[in-house]
Amino acid sequence: MENTQENPASQSAEENGSETQAAQDAAPAAEAADAALAEAQAKVAELQESYLRAKAETENVRRRAQEDVAKAHKFAIESFAEHLLPVLDSLEAAVGDTSGDIAKVREGVELTLRQLTSALEKGRVVAINPVGEKFDPHRHQAISMVPADQEPNTVVTVLQKGYTIADRVLRPALVTVAQPK
């Protein structure tokens, strides 16, 4: 019978040699893994910083937009008010006039009306004067129906003008409408 057992000392030396070889082989891999980890951590830090900058910029844009909207609301009427100042000046001059000349007062009132109409038009306020138009319940308010030679549901007279601002009705025109025959 042959002895197939190896010497325990030689077996231990072989294991130590293979472990040393494995450790030597693992060292470059560990260094590469450490380098990859460090690179990934640096990338994460960079992305976090970019995220925080983008978030701060977004907040600044949102805040500026809110401030712009607040200013727009606050000063929206400024231009309109500037156009009304000449009307105010004319009315104050008329009140201060003590001449008693009716023709002069009438001329001043007509001028003031033209100034007011101009100021309203600059503010995009437009009169609705729909005589002869088809009745539109969105723009007109019928006060009565009257017999007329016009087509039924046509505006016959305007009792009070209506007004729109940028195609939105501020006040509907008060009208009488032709009765169906």
Swiss-Prot record:
Region (Disordered): 1-39
Cross-referenced Pfam families: GrpE
UniProt-listed GO biological process terms: protein folding
Lineage: superkingdom: Bacteria
CDD domains per the UniProt record, alphabetical: GrpE
Subcellular location: Cytoplasm
Bias (Polar residues): 1-20
Parts forming coiled coils: none
PROSITE patterns: GRPE (PS01071)
A molecular function GO annotation: unfolded protein binding
Bias (Low complexity): 21-39
InterPro entries: GrpE (IPR000740), GrpE_coiled_coil (IPR013805), GrpE_head (IPR009012)
Family: Belongs to the GrpE family.
Function: Participates actively in the response to hyperosmotic and heat shock by preventing the aggregation of stress-denatured proteins, in association with DnaK and GrpE. It is the nucleotide exchange factor for DnaK and may function as a thermosensor. Unfolded proteins bind initially to DnaJ; upon interaction with the DnaJ-bound protein, DnaK hydrolyzes its bound ATP, resulting in the formation of a stable complex. GrpE releases ADP from DnaK; ATP binding to DnaK triggers the release of the substrate protein, thus completing the reaction cycle.
PANTHER family, per database record: GRPE PROTEIN, GRPE PROTEIN HOMOLOG, MITOCHONDRIAL
Protein name: Protein GrpE
Organism for this UniProt entry: Burkholderia multivorans (strain ATCC 17616 / 249)
Gene encoding the protein: grpE
